[in-house]
Every structure is written in C-alpha cells, then in structure tokens.
Amino acid sequence: MCTAATYKTKDFYFGRTLDYEFSYGDDVTVTPRNYVFDFRHEGKLESHYAIVGMAHVADGYPLYYDAVNEKGLGMAGLNFVGNAKYQEVSEGRENVAQFEFIPWILAQCGSVAQAREYLGRMNLVGTTFNEHFPAAQLHWLIADKEEAVTVECTASGLQVYDNPVGVLTNNPPFELQMFMLNNYCLLYTSDA
C-alpha cells in the first residue's frame, strides 16, 4: 500500500512509497523555474517555483506522483479509487485538472497556508491528459515544516482536512484513516 509521510526533527522530511510491481516509466523529474506549464483551463504559467519529484513524463509534461518545491512544500497523490469524484468546469473558479494539481500547487505556493488560499478558489476537474491517460482517482497530502493537510474531491465536493499525523495512505477516506488510528492507541514508546 502506498503511503506518504512527513517527519519533523530540526529538519523537515517528506516522502512516499510507490508500491507497484511494475514501472509506469517514472523517474526522478526536475521542473525548473522557467519551464512553461500550459494548464488546460487556466493558461500558461511561465514563472514559478522549481519542483523535483517522481513523475512519468508524457509529451514533455511531468505527470507527478509526488514532489517538493524549492520552498519545502511537498505533495503526494495516493490511490482513492471508488471515492474520488471530480467536478465539472465551472465559471468563476480556477479549474485545475487532477493531473495538473501537484504542479498547480507546488509551482505557486510556498506553504500549506498559501495552498489553502489556492484551494479555496480552485475547482478540481476530471479533464483527462489524453485518451491513453484517464483521470486517476486520487487524494493528496500537502505538507510543509509547519503543518499538513489532506485534500479529497468526492461527490460532496472538495474537502480539505487538517492532518495532524502528517501521513496518508491509499483508500479509505481520510476521516476513516484517522478513526482507525484508535486501533493503535495502546501502543506507546518508552525509555524502558
């Protein structure tokens, strides 16, 4: 099961596992500041933060699984099959296709606080990359050294949850993942 996790000491760490038996042709991918993102519904973005992460590059476009930008903001998409439901394009909102979501946030936001502002005016849509790449059903962890949030787009709309543990797995929905932590409340660490 894929898992994204944060770890804080005097430094901040962000990472994820990608538990597949085969490769989709993914590779470590760097998107420099001057790479032009051509968003399907929002046009071109020519100046942005640099991004590094794991992606499959198709037609010159990085389809990120997870990444971190130069400001230390990290983001990972994990399977959410059967629960993800994207919206239709809506006038007056910033319409972002699910495959553009990671670069949309990481290119423009330097913190989770700033990402929350972008999420407040964003509409996550199911526009496909092409006929070979249907919209992936995902939910996301966004984190920096201060906080983490989980983003889910369901039939109820776009939900942003505070994520106090800084961890996200594939299904089930985030609220159920948090509830299931009760199964482990008797575990503790000690110096003994």
Task: Please place each PLM-identified region on the residue numbering.
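Active-site nucleophilic cysteine motif
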Residues: 2, 133-134
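Compact, glycine/acidic-enriched structural inserts
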Residues: 36, 89-122
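Secretory/export targeting leaders with adjacent low-complexity proregions
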Residues: 117-133, 139-141
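Extended amphipathic alpha-helical segments with heptad-repeat/coiled-coil character used for oligomerization
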Residues: 134-179
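Conserved small/polar residues in nucleotide/adenosyl-binding loops
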Residues: 188-192
